[in-house]
């Protein structure tokens, strides 16, 4: 029989979170962002639950092809555009929209021979300083695209650097001002709102655009944790990583556990060994005290996470033993929830990373 570790994808939670975004921006169309294999959930596992979106957005053509193969006939957007000229042929054939963020991509379009016009999102670098044309160069890039017979439709986009951080509204306002100054009289749809801007600013006039691009919120993680929890935003966990107790040890005072003896018992302590380790995607740098649920009861990890196992304190769960359910993050069978953001905080990272890091050897199921 397989190891008891399992990742469960919750379809109802995905639908709930999508609707939560709809409520925040009722007048906008939604790109459901499924990059990084739907944040580690698996595109095929989330597609049915998210097909209520107006479009799907991702990074590469392989993911776009998978969405088309699942039967999606609506808009698909490549958020980073094409990576080489030959990608344009597949974009044309599969009717895939793509971002344009540099002169090279415009050059490739100009040289591309096609009978099907391309729909593009011209990206502005309004302050993120990763991809896009600066405000000073943006209109010239638009003019080049607008002159190309290969381009059927031009829309406009930018990406916020501080929507989830302390800069908050002032940071958003500065970037939006640059974006609006450069595009205010240009025809075409606009897209600016990421997860944090969509929930934190809602249907504010500053961020109201034709399209929003929710990502992490669809998967039940707070876009601005620890300022706000997922529960604050009425988001539900869409991924549960669970396993079982496969061994029980009784420690006495002075005994330690695991590599490096990083935890030493200060008195009698009952310990459970869990079939989950860093080779499954659980963060190795989670130390003693990382929250975990056993039979739906909150307790803590003990010592060092090893490749295939970790240890938990069974003191708060006296009825736990061999085979007891362990929830590493997500929803336990009794309905108790351990937010992925709390585990990520203990590991010094983000919920995004934990979702994406679940290893291929962990079986996935959909409920």
UniProtKB/Swiss-Prot annotation:
One of its GO terms (biological process) is D-alanine biosynthetic process. Its cofactor is pyridoxal 5'-phosphate. GO terms for cellular component: cytosol. Keywords: Isomerase, Pyridoxal phosphate. It holds the Pfam family Ala_racemase_C. Belongs to the alanine racemase family. This is Alanine racemase. The gene is alr.
């Amino acid at each position: 029989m397989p190891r008891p570790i399992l990742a469960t994808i919750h379809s109802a939670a995905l639908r709930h979170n999508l609707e939560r975004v709809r409520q925040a921006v009722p007048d906008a169309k939604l790109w459901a962002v499924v990059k990084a294999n739907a944040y580690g959930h698996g595109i095929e596992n989330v597609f049915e639950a998210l097909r209520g979106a107006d479009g799907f957005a991702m990074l590469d053509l392989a993911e776009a092809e998978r969405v088309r193969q699942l039967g999606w006939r609506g808009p698909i957007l490549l958020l980073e555009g094409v990576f080489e000229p030959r990608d344009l042929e597949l974009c044309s054939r599969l009717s895939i929209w793509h971002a344009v963020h540099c002169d090279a991509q415009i050059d490739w379009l100009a040289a591309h021979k096609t009978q099907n016009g391309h729909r593009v999102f011209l990206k502005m670098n309004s302050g993120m300083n990763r991809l896009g044309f600066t405000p000073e160069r943006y209109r010239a890039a638009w003019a080049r695209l607008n002159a190309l017979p290969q381009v059927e439709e031009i829309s406009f986009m930018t990406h916020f650097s501080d929507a989830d951080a302390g800069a908050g509204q002032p940071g958003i306002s500065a970037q939006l001002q640059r974006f609006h100054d450069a595009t205010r009289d240009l025809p075409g749809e606009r897209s600016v709102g990421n997860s944090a801007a969509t929930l934190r600013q809602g249907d504010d006039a500053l961020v109201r655009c034709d399209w929003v691009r929710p990502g992490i919120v669809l998967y039940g993680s707070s876009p601005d944790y620890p300022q706000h929890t997922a529960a604050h935003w009425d988001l539900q966990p869409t991924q549960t990583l669970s396993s079982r107790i496969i061994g029980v040890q009784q420690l006495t005072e002075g005994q330690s556990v695991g590599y490096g003896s990083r935890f030493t018992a200060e008195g009698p302590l009952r310990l459970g060994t869990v079939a989950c380790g860093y080779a499954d995607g659980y963060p190795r740098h989670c130390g003693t005290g990382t929250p975990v649920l056993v039979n739906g009861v909150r307790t803590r990890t003990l010592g060092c996470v090893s490749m295939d196992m970790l240890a938990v304190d069974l003191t708060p769960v006296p009825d736990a033993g061999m085979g007891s359910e362990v929830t590493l993050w997500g929803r336990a069978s009794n309905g108790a929830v351990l937010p992925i953001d709390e585990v990520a905080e203990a590991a010094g990272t983000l919920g995004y990373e934990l979702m994406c890091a679940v290893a291929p050897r962990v079986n996935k199921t959909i409920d």
